[in-house]
Amino acid sequence: MKKIEVDLVRTKVYNLLKEMILNHELKLGEKLNVRELSEKLGISFTPVRDALLQLATEGLVKVVPRVGFFVTDVDEKFIRETIETRIMMEVFCLENYFDKIAGSEELLEIKGEIDDVEKSAKREIFDDSDERLHKLFIRASGNELIISLYEKIWDRIDLVRHLNERYVVSNREHKELIERIISGDKEGAIEKLKEHLKNVEAETIKNLYTYERS
């Protein structure tokens, strides 16, 4: 097989496995049998192993020597550290680049998506607006290092946020947050962002104890 074809297969397998982890088709803490996954995906052993090794570097898979691969498990510490890091980064960016965020056309586009979620209650629309809003704060900094660091932890954020079932409530909090930004209420927006993220933390931890593991 040519190198370009090998790379395409590896990328496809990586994306498939990543999606299976994030939507919890592969359960938190589940042991991953490479040969079974190879058969399920109809692909050879090597691309699956390579994809799992890549996912391990991103924190979605854990490698235990002489034992095998496991989906990263999530506990209270994992959730608290993830949210704490988000608060540090997102609040800093909202506070220091408030005017740039408030004047962004994308903010109005996101507000439109939030209105759509209110009408349809569709999780997929919420997930898109959620990612766009929080990444908007980070990108507004224009700081390539901050943006890069946030992207590196996004898979961890994604794993946590898919445990949160309160998306209709989160959507309302997003709407209130955007309204405060648009109105120029900087301090109110900062407090709302902190409150929102702490609410996500509390609800995710609560859901953790009802999550059905493998």
Q: What residue ranges belong to the model's regions?
A:
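A short secondary-structure junction motif
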Residues: 20, 24, 153-160, 203, ...
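Short linear motifs at protein or domain termini
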Residues: 1-96, 209-214
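Conserved amphipathic alpha-helical segments that form helical-bundle/coiled-coil interaction surfaces
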Residues: 102-166, 172-179, 188-199
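Juxtamembrane/interface motifs at transmembrane-helix termini
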Residues: 49-50, 100-103, 167-171, 207-214
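Short, flexible helix/strand-to-coil boundary loops that buttress conserved ligand/catalytic motifs
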Residues: 75, 83, 150, 161, ...
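C-terminal effector-binding regulatory domain of bacterial HTH transcription factors
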Residues: 3, 190-214
